[in-house]
Amino acid sequence: MSEKFNPDNLEKLNNPERLNLIDLRELLKILDLKDDPKIADVGAGTGLFSRAFLEKLPNCTLYALDISDEFLNYMDINLQEYYGDRLKIGKMQETHIPLKDNSIDLIVMINLHHELLSPKELLKDAYRVLKEEGKIFIADWKEGMHKGALSKDSIISDMKEAAFSPIEEVLLSNELICLIGER
């Protein structure tokens, strides 16, 4: 990730106010997931959004994945005991998700896309791990909201190149572009 988040700023990343960036309740309505979904939070950071999904979906299994050992340790200390077997914490590489092919119902990537050196490669790997008709949710800064923000068209182009179709923009945030793609 080109501008990897500095773990010294962990409290900023873990600020509960960030949960207000996205209307998660509406997102879950739109996604219409089955009763016991398998979810991968790619670039999970401190697990703030992982925790929110685990709370809202009590029967889900969630894989919280990150490249940073500091963030993985933070999640292990602060989340693992509370969520037990429902939470799987794992180290990933920037372009590789360490999960089996066709194993995940939903991948979420929140404020990650603009930090990636090779977003198309990661999206191709996300496609690989998604089940047939699985979905990816990408939320990232709208242009002008963050110094590294990408255009919506650029993100959609990356998703198309990874074979996601259809791709739908959903209005869940004033600050973030929110896109759902299907395998």
What residue ranges belong to the model's regions?
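A short acidic, Gly/Pro-enriched loop at the edge of an enzyme's catalytic core
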Residues: 95-107
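A short SAM/SAH-binding and catalytic strip from SAM-dependent methyltransferases
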Residues: 105-118
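Conserved SAM-binding loop and adjacent beta-strand
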Residues: 9-26, 147-148
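Short alpha-helix
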Residues: 148-162, 177
